[in-house]
Amino acid sequence: MIEFRGLAKQFGTRIVLRDIDLAIVPGRITGIIGPNGAGKTTLMKSILGLVRADCGDVVVDAARDATYRSRIGYMPQIARFPENLSTAELFAMLRDLRGDTRPVDQQLVQQLGLQTYLDTPLRVLSGGTRQKVNAALAFAFTPDLLILDEPTAGLDPVAAGILKDKILEQRELGRTVVITSHILAELDELCDDVVFLLDGTVRFAGSVHDLKLRTRQFSLERAVAAMMTAGAAA
């Protein structure tokens, strides 16, 4: 389980997270949703240790220290790769850094068509192919927890479908997925639960079904729009 206990973060005079108390249920797919600037990326990066909270704790499976991070697969919205390496060299470098001799998920590499680019320098890959490499890295080494930031951005429909199937497969394997996307129809398809952030606070945390019931809407997109309208009027 991922727990946020009194988490707060401020950048200069801008308050990004306000006293977040939240639990993310293990073995489920949870979407972090909200408008731009709501604190979604900051919340996700706090799990990874890429953002340090001003106060409060992030606890993963009862661990407050950084030991749990070796069990995380992370797919950033925009990946930064060493441009001089080939795709295969990048995979090998990460195996060495992690001290893990297991190969990258070869099935996913094949499905995404990356075998053609294993010897290609990363600097010459197209944006869509780089995003496929980004996805393969996130699922490498069979992580217990996946943090995915706009995972299908830049992917063609076939690759996006392959990736969504891979995400759904993780739930069947009992793994936890935390995902953010501006494509709410995609989250409606994938997620069991959602956390709706607005102005750095949690306005809803629960199942997608319960959010639709609460807002009396038939889709996640309309439910979120209703929450945002209600928040603006408050």
Please provide the spans of the model-predicted regions.
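Helix-to-loop junction immediately C-terminal to a conserved catalytic motif
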Residues: 48
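Catalytic Walker B motif of ABC-type/P-loop ATPase nucleotide-binding domains
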Residues: 146-150
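Conserved ABC transporter NBD signature motif
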Residues: 52-68
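Conserved ABC ATPase "signature" region
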Residues: 92, 96, 102-117
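Conserved structural motif at the start of ABC-family nucleotide-binding domains
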Residues: 2, 17-19
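Conserved ABC ATPase signature
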Residues: 121-128
